[in-house]
Amino acid sequence: MLISVTLYAAHTSQARLSLLKPLIKYNTPFSTEISTDSITVWEKLLEPELEEQQHYSLLFQLKLLTVRALITEGHFSLAIDKANSMYQKAKEMSYSLGTALSLQAIGNTYLNSSTPLAAIESYKEALEIISKDLMQTNM
């Protein structure tokens, strides 16, 4: 019984990820197979596994998708809270891609809550981080 439960849990995580990956790739929280509410729930379920496996890029992309889903539902305060916690986590990890994705999430939230100047600042900061990383990689 324990083995089948473990296998089921692993299978459902893989199934969830396979459904979420196209949404992440195209940066859209819309799908006929997944509701925006499911994206939010699945992010919470998948986070520990992705952290354990050190799939940080996928984890932060999933968090960005979750923020987009919250924005789509009109939950701006939840979206900004999620984006800010995402930013704090990336900073604690010193993970520049996570920081840049967090700033994109913050910018998306500002843009959709009619504060475009704050959004632009977040986007600029994200681009600066990515540019700096690219320059260091190419040296």
Locate each region found by the language model.
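Amphipathic alpha-helical segments of tetratricopeptide repeats
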Residues: 44-51, 84-91, 124-135
